[in-house]
Amino acid sequence: MNSRLRHWREAATLLLAAGAPARPPRSPLGPFDYELLLLQRSSRSGFAPSAHVFPGGLVEAADFSADWLGLLPASPQCGLGLVRPPPPGSCRAPLFATDRVQLGSPLPGEVAFRICAIRETFEEAGILLLVPGRGPAAGSGPAPPLPAARLPPAAELSEWRRRVQEDPACFLQLCRHLGCVPNIWALQEWSNWLTPVGRTGRGARRYDAAFYLCCLERRPPLTSQDDREVTAFLWSSPPEAIERFKSQEIWFPPPQFYELCRLCNFSSFHELHKFSSDRALEGCERWMPVMLTASDGDIELLPGKKTDEGSFKCIKAWKLLHTQAT
Protein backbone atom coordinates (compact mmCIF):
# COMPACT_ATOMS: atom_id res chain seq x y z
CA MET A 1 0.00 0.00 0.00
CA ASN A 2 1.55 3.26 -1.15
CA SER A 3 0.58 6.02 1.30
CA ARG A 4 2.77 8.51 -0.58
CA LEU A 5 0.34 8.82 -3.47
CA ARG A 6 -1.55 12.11 -3.47
CA HIS A 7 -3.70 12.16 -6.59
CA TRP A 8 -5.05 8.62 -6.85
CA ARG A 9 -5.36 5.39 -4.88
CA GLU A 10 -4.15 1.90 -5.77
CA ALA A 11 -6.68 -0.83 -6.53
CA ALA A 12 -6.96 -4.32 -7.99
CA THR A 13 -9.59 -5.76 -10.32
CA LEU A 14 -10.31 -9.34 -11.38
CA LEU A 15 -11.64 -10.55 -14.71
CA LEU A 16 -13.07 -13.90 -13.59
CA ALA A 17 -13.73 -16.28 -16.49
CA ALA A 18 -15.41 -19.65 -15.92
CA GLY A 19 -15.81 -22.50 -18.38
CA ALA A 20 -19.40 -23.01 -19.54
CA PRO A 21 -21.20 -25.04 -22.22
CA ALA A 22 -21.45 -23.10 -25.46
CA ARG A 23 -25.02 -21.97 -26.14
CA PRO A 24 -26.75 -20.20 -29.03
CA PRO A 25 -25.10 -16.78 -29.21
CA ARG A 26 -26.76 -13.37 -29.08
CA SER A 27 -24.00 -11.90 -31.24
CA PRO A 28 -22.60 -12.69 -34.72
CA LEU A 29 -19.25 -13.72 -33.18
CA GLY A 30 -20.52 -17.25 -32.58
CA PRO A 31 -20.64 -19.38 -29.43
CA PHE A 32 -18.21 -18.82 -26.56
CA ASP A 33 -17.48 -21.63 -24.09
CA TYR A 34 -16.86 -19.40 -21.08
CA GLU A 35 -18.53 -16.61 -19.13
CA LEU A 36 -17.30 -13.59 -17.18
CA LEU A 37 -18.57 -12.41 -13.82
CA LEU A 38 -20.05 -8.90 -13.92
CA LEU A 39 -21.26 -7.06 -10.82
CA GLN A 40 -23.71 -4.16 -10.78
CA ARG A 41 -22.64 -1.36 -8.48
CA SER A 42 -25.12 0.27 -6.15
CA SER A 43 -26.95 3.34 -7.46
CA ARG A 44 -25.70 5.10 -4.32
CA SER A 45 -22.05 4.47 -5.17
CA GLY A 46 -19.86 7.55 -5.38
CA PHE A 47 -17.95 6.07 -8.34
CA ALA A 48 -19.65 4.64 -11.46
CA PRO A 49 -23.11 4.21 -9.84
CA SER A 50 -25.27 1.41 -11.30
CA ALA A 51 -22.48 0.38 -13.70
CA HIS A 52 -21.59 -3.26 -14.34
CA VAL A 53 -17.97 -3.88 -13.43
CA PHE A 54 -15.52 -6.67 -12.66
CA PRO A 55 -14.94 -7.54 -8.99
CA GLY A 56 -12.31 -5.41 -7.31
CA GLY A 57 -11.56 -2.53 -5.01
CA LEU A 58 -9.02 -0.52 -3.08
CA VAL A 59 -5.81 -2.04 -1.79
CA GLU A 60 -5.68 -2.15 2.01
CA ALA A 61 -2.74 -2.29 4.40
CA ALA A 62 -3.83 -5.84 5.32
CA ASP A 63 -3.10 -6.98 1.75
CA PHE A 64 0.56 -6.03 2.30
CA SER A 65 0.78 -7.56 5.77
CA ALA A 66 4.01 -9.43 6.52
CA ASP A 67 1.85 -12.12 8.15
CA TRP A 68 1.05 -13.47 4.68
CA LEU A 69 4.66 -14.65 4.43
CA GLY A 70 3.88 -17.21 7.12
CA LEU A 71 1.20 -18.78 4.92
CA LEU A 72 2.59 -18.48 1.40
CA PRO A 73 5.61 -20.33 -0.07
CA ALA A 74 9.00 -18.93 0.89
CA SER A 75 10.32 -19.01 -2.69
CA PRO A 76 11.00 -15.70 -4.50
CA GLN A 77 7.80 -13.83 -5.37
CA CYS A 78 5.96 -16.60 -3.43
CA GLY A 79 6.26 -18.87 -6.46
CA LEU A 80 4.93 -16.43 -9.06
CA GLY A 81 6.68 -16.40 -12.42
CA LEU A 82 9.06 -13.54 -13.19
CA VAL A 83 8.02 -10.93 -15.73
CA ARG A 84 10.51 -10.34 -18.55
CA PRO A 85 12.30 -6.96 -18.64
CA PRO A 86 10.34 -4.45 -20.74
CA PRO A 87 11.58 -3.82 -24.30
CA PRO A 88 13.44 -0.60 -25.15
CA GLY A 89 11.15 2.39 -25.19
CA SER A 90 8.69 1.00 -22.66
CA CYS A 91 8.66 0.54 -18.92
CA ARG A 92 7.09 -1.60 -16.23
CA ALA A 93 3.91 -0.10 -14.81
CA PRO A 94 4.85 1.95 -11.70
CA LEU A 95 2.21 0.03 -9.79
CA PHE A 96 4.36 -3.09 -10.09
CA ALA A 97 7.81 -1.50 -10.35
CA THR A 98 7.58 0.30 -7.00
CA ASP A 99 9.93 -1.13 -4.38
CA ARG A 100 7.50 -2.05 -1.62
CA VAL A 101 10.27 -2.71 0.89
CA GLN A 102 11.02 1.02 0.86
CA LEU A 103 7.37 1.58 1.74
CA GLY A 104 7.59 -0.72 4.75
CA SER A 105 6.23 -4.00 3.37
CA PRO A 106 8.29 -7.14 2.71
CA LEU A 107 5.48 -8.51 0.54
CA PRO A 108 5.98 -7.91 -3.22
CA GLY A 109 3.37 -5.80 -4.93
CA GLU A 110 2.66 -8.62 -7.40
CA VAL A 111 1.53 -10.75 -4.43
CA ALA A 112 -0.35 -8.08 -2.48
CA PHE A 113 -2.40 -6.84 -5.44
CA ARG A 114 -3.48 -10.40 -6.18
CA ILE A 115 -4.50 -10.87 -2.56
CA CYS A 116 -6.52 -7.65 -2.81
CA ALA A 117 -8.34 -8.83 -5.96
CA ILE A 118 -9.15 -12.20 -4.35
CA ARG A 119 -10.31 -10.59 -1.10
CA GLU A 120 -12.55 -8.11 -2.92
CA THR A 121 -14.06 -10.92 -5.01
CA PHE A 122 -15.04 -12.66 -1.78
CA GLU A 123 -16.45 -9.47 -0.26
CA GLU A 124 -18.47 -8.48 -3.33
CA ALA A 125 -19.47 -11.83 -4.85
CA GLY A 126 -19.00 -14.41 -2.08
CA ILE A 127 -16.46 -16.37 -4.15
CA LEU A 128 -13.39 -17.78 -2.40
CA LEU A 129 -10.43 -18.23 -4.75
CA LEU A 130 -8.30 -20.32 -2.41
CA VAL A 131 -6.18 -23.47 -2.59
CA PRO A 132 -5.59 -25.92 0.28
CA GLY A 133 -2.21 -25.87 2.00
CA ARG A 134 0.49 -23.40 1.02
CA GLY A 135 -0.02 -23.65 -2.76
CA PRO A 136 0.53 -23.34 -5.60
CA ALA A 137 -2.13 -25.59 -7.05
CA ALA A 138 -0.89 -28.51 -9.14
CA GLY A 139 -1.37 -28.49 -12.91
CA SER A 140 -1.17 -25.81 -15.56
CA GLY A 141 -4.80 -25.71 -16.73
CA PRO A 142 -7.68 -23.52 -15.57
CA ALA A 143 -7.99 -23.49 -11.78
CA PRO A 144 -10.61 -25.68 -10.10
CA PRO A 145 -12.97 -23.97 -7.64
CA LEU A 146 -12.31 -24.62 -3.96
CA PRO A 147 -14.04 -27.95 -3.16
CA ALA A 148 -17.36 -27.49 -1.38
CA ALA A 149 -16.11 -29.81 1.37
CA ARG A 150 -13.51 -27.18 2.29
CA LEU A 151 -16.12 -24.46 2.70
CA PRO A 152 -17.73 -23.77 6.08
CA PRO A 153 -21.54 -23.87 6.44
CA ALA A 154 -23.37 -21.06 4.65
CA ALA A 155 -24.18 -19.13 7.83
CA GLU A 156 -20.57 -19.28 9.02
CA LEU A 157 -19.26 -18.25 5.60
CA SER A 158 -21.69 -15.32 5.54
CA GLU A 159 -20.40 -14.22 8.94
CA TRP A 160 -16.80 -14.41 7.72
CA ARG A 161 -17.76 -12.34 4.70
CA ARG A 162 -19.26 -9.67 6.94
CA ARG A 163 -16.15 -9.64 9.10
CA VAL A 164 -13.84 -9.26 6.10
CA GLN A 165 -15.96 -6.41 4.78
CA GLU A 166 -15.63 -4.66 8.13
CA ASP A 167 -11.93 -5.45 8.58
CA PRO A 168 -9.79 -6.65 5.62
CA ALA A 169 -7.29 -8.18 8.08
CA CYS A 170 -9.92 -10.85 8.81
CA PHE A 171 -9.29 -12.33 5.36
CA LEU A 172 -5.94 -13.68 6.53
CA GLN A 173 -7.68 -15.09 9.62
CA LEU A 174 -10.21 -16.82 7.36
CA CYS A 175 -7.43 -18.41 5.30
CA ARG A 176 -5.78 -19.70 8.46
CA HIS A 177 -9.11 -21.05 9.70
CA LEU A 178 -9.68 -22.98 6.46
CA GLY A 179 -6.07 -24.14 6.09
CA CYS A 180 -5.90 -22.47 2.68
CA VAL A 181 -4.10 -19.62 0.91
CA PRO A 182 -5.27 -17.17 -1.77
CA ASN A 183 -4.76 -18.74 -5.19
CA ILE A 184 -2.48 -15.95 -6.39
CA TRP A 185 -0.99 -18.30 -9.02
CA ALA A 186 -4.29 -18.47 -10.92
CA LEU A 187 -4.33 -14.70 -11.47
CA GLN A 188 -2.50 -13.54 -14.59
CA GLU A 189 -1.33 -9.96 -14.99
CA TRP A 190 -3.58 -8.48 -17.68
CA SER A 191 -3.56 -4.66 -17.75
CA ASN A 192 -3.17 -1.49 -15.68
CA TRP A 193 -5.61 1.42 -15.90
CA LEU A 194 -5.22 4.87 -14.36
CA THR A 195 -8.39 6.96 -14.13
CA PRO A 196 -8.03 10.04 -16.35
CA VAL A 197 -8.58 13.59 -15.16
CA GLY A 198 -12.26 14.12 -15.89
CA ARG A 199 -14.50 17.08 -16.39
CA THR A 200 -14.85 17.52 -12.63
CA GLY A 201 -11.14 18.36 -12.49
CA ARG A 202 -9.08 18.17 -9.34
CA GLY A 203 -10.52 16.35 -6.36
CA ALA A 204 -12.36 13.69 -8.38
CA ARG A 205 -11.81 10.05 -7.46
CA ARG A 206 -8.98 8.43 -9.39
CA TYR A 207 -7.59 4.91 -9.20
CA ASP A 208 -4.46 3.15 -10.41
CA ALA A 209 -5.88 -0.34 -10.87
CA ALA A 210 -4.12 -3.61 -11.61
CA PHE A 211 -6.33 -5.84 -13.78
CA TYR A 212 -5.87 -9.60 -13.48
CA LEU A 213 -7.45 -12.46 -15.42
CA CYS A 214 -8.35 -15.74 -13.72
CA CYS A 215 -9.67 -18.79 -15.57
CA LEU A 216 -11.75 -21.25 -13.52
CA GLU A 217 -12.72 -24.70 -14.80
CA ARG A 218 -16.36 -23.95 -14.03
CA ARG A 219 -18.51 -21.52 -12.13
CA PRO A 220 -17.92 -21.47 -8.38
CA PRO A 221 -20.67 -23.24 -6.40
CA LEU A 222 -21.75 -20.01 -4.70
CA THR A 223 -22.10 -16.51 -6.16
CA SER A 224 -24.08 -13.76 -4.44
CA GLN A 225 -24.13 -9.98 -4.31
CA ASP A 226 -23.42 -8.33 -0.98
CA ASP A 227 -26.38 -5.90 -1.30
CA ARG A 228 -24.10 -3.12 -0.13
CA GLU A 229 -21.63 -2.12 -2.83
CA VAL A 230 -23.10 -4.67 -5.27
CA THR A 231 -26.83 -5.09 -5.98
CA ALA A 232 -26.82 -7.76 -8.71
CA PHE A 233 -24.49 -10.06 -10.62
CA LEU A 234 -24.40 -11.52 -14.09
CA TRP A 235 -22.44 -14.31 -15.78
CA SER A 236 -22.09 -13.51 -19.47
CA SER A 237 -19.86 -14.21 -22.45
CA PRO A 238 -17.96 -11.14 -23.71
CA PRO A 239 -20.01 -10.64 -26.90
CA GLU A 240 -23.30 -11.10 -25.04
CA ALA A 241 -22.21 -8.46 -22.55
CA ILE A 242 -21.38 -6.07 -25.40
CA GLU A 243 -24.80 -6.74 -26.97
CA ARG A 244 -26.47 -5.93 -23.65
CA PHE A 245 -24.51 -2.69 -23.58
CA LYS A 246 -25.52 -1.78 -27.14
CA SER A 247 -29.19 -2.35 -26.27
CA GLN A 248 -28.69 -0.18 -23.16
CA GLU A 249 -29.67 -2.99 -20.79
CA ILE A 250 -26.46 -2.38 -18.86
CA TRP A 251 -23.63 0.17 -18.84
CA PHE A 252 -19.86 -0.29 -18.52
CA PRO A 253 -17.17 2.20 -17.53
CA PRO A 254 -14.57 2.62 -20.30
CA PRO A 255 -11.94 0.11 -19.02
CA GLN A 256 -14.55 -2.65 -18.68
CA PHE A 257 -15.93 -1.90 -22.13
CA TYR A 258 -12.45 -2.01 -23.66
CA GLU A 259 -11.46 -5.24 -21.89
CA LEU A 260 -14.68 -6.97 -22.93
CA CYS A 261 -14.04 -5.97 -26.55
CA ARG A 262 -10.51 -7.32 -26.18
CA LEU A 263 -11.83 -10.65 -24.86
CA CYS A 264 -14.12 -10.97 -27.88
CA ASN A 265 -10.99 -12.14 -29.73
CA PHE A 266 -11.11 -15.40 -27.76
CA SER A 267 -14.12 -17.68 -28.20
CA SER A 268 -12.21 -20.70 -26.82
CA PHE A 269 -11.77 -20.86 -23.06
CA HIS A 270 -8.56 -22.86 -23.30
CA GLU A 271 -7.12 -20.47 -25.90
CA LEU A 272 -7.87 -17.59 -23.55
CA HIS A 273 -6.19 -19.39 -20.67
CA LYS A 274 -3.08 -20.19 -22.72
CA PHE A 275 -2.84 -16.66 -24.10
CA SER A 276 -3.22 -15.04 -20.69
CA SER A 277 -0.61 -17.34 -19.14
CA ASP A 278 1.91 -16.65 -21.92
CA ARG A 279 1.13 -12.95 -22.18
CA ALA A 280 1.46 -12.37 -18.42
CA LEU A 281 5.21 -12.96 -18.70
CA GLU A 282 5.45 -9.76 -20.77
CA GLY A 283 4.00 -7.58 -18.00
CA CYS A 284 2.01 -4.49 -18.88
CA GLU A 285 2.25 -0.73 -19.15
CA ARG A 286 0.06 1.75 -17.37
CA TRP A 287 -2.68 3.19 -19.57
CA MET A 288 -4.30 6.54 -18.83
CA PRO A 289 -6.93 7.60 -21.37
CA VAL A 290 -6.94 11.24 -22.42
CA MET A 291 -10.28 13.04 -22.41
CA LEU A 292 -11.32 14.87 -25.57
CA THR A 293 -14.45 17.00 -25.47
CA ALA A 294 -16.43 17.14 -28.72
CA SER A 295 -19.51 19.19 -29.58
CA ASP A 296 -21.81 16.20 -29.04
CA GLY A 297 -20.08 14.24 -26.28
CA ASP A 298 -16.83 13.12 -24.73
CA ILE A 299 -14.18 10.81 -26.17
CA GLU A 300 -11.45 8.91 -24.38
CA LEU A 301 -8.30 8.42 -26.42
CA LEU A 302 -5.98 5.51 -25.70
CA PRO A 303 -2.22 5.23 -26.23
CA GLY A 304 -1.40 4.75 -29.90
CA LYS A 305 -4.81 5.95 -31.12
CA LYS A 306 -4.79 9.00 -33.39
CA THR A 307 -7.72 11.23 -34.19
CA ASP A 308 -7.70 10.40 -37.87
CA GLU A 309 -10.04 8.41 -40.08
CA GLY A 310 -8.08 5.21 -39.50
CA SER A 311 -9.04 5.18 -35.84
CA PHE A 312 -12.62 6.42 -36.32
CA LYS A 313 -14.23 3.15 -35.22
CA CYS A 314 -12.35 3.15 -31.93
CA ILE A 315 -13.22 6.78 -31.25
CA LYS A 316 -16.84 6.21 -32.21
CA ALA A 317 -17.11 3.36 -29.71
CA TRP A 318 -15.76 5.45 -26.87
CA LYS A 319 -17.91 8.40 -27.92
CA LEU A 320 -21.00 6.19 -27.87
CA LEU A 321 -20.01 4.93 -24.45
CA HIS A 322 -19.83 8.39 -22.91
CA THR A 323 -22.88 9.70 -24.74
CA GLN A 324 -25.01 6.92 -23.25
CA ALA A 325 -23.52 7.45 -19.82
CA THR A 326 -24.35 11.13 -19.59
Language-model regions: role of each:
Residues 1-326:
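N-terminal leader/linker segments that precede catalytic domains of diphosphate-processing enzymes
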